[in-house]
């Protein structure tokens, strides 16, 4: 992986818990990626 692909947090699942975890991590300044199996 290149430096631009690095994350501090990877959240698997966009349900209620994953959604809150991803938002909180981003608010704390962590580079965050959320992965969801279903498209929108």
UniProtKB/Swiss-Prot annotation:
EC number of the protein:
1.8.1.4
Q: Does the keyword Flavoprotein apply?
A: yes
UniProt keyword terms in alphabetical order: FAD, Flavoprotein, Mitochondrion, NAD, Oxidoreductase, Redox-active center
Q: What are its GO cellular component terms?
A: mitochondrial matrix
Domain of life according to the entry: Eukaryota
The record ties this protein, via InterPro entries, to: Class-I_Pyr_Nuc-Dis_Oxidored, FAD/NAD-bd_sf
- Required co-factor? FAD
Which GO MF terms does the UniProt record name? Answer: dihydrolipoyl dehydrogenase (NADH) activity
Q: In the record's cofactor note, how is the cofactor described as bound? A: Binds 1 FAD per subunit.
Reactions catalysed = N(6)-[(R)-dihydrolipoyl]-L-lysyl-[protein] + NAD(+) = N(6)-[(R)-lipoyl]-L-lysyl-[protein] + NADH + H(+)
Q: Where in the cell is it found?
A: Mitochondrion matrix
Q: Which Gene3D superfamilies match?
A: FAD/NAD(P)-binding domain
Other information:
The active site is a redox-active disulfide bond.
Name under which the protein is recorded = Dihydrolipoyl dehydrogenase
């Amino acid at each position: 992986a290149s430096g631009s692909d690095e994350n501090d947090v990877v959240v698997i699942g966009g349900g209620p818990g994953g959604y809150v975890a991803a938002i909180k991590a981003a608010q704390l300044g962590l580079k965050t990626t959320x992965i969801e199996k279903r498209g929108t």
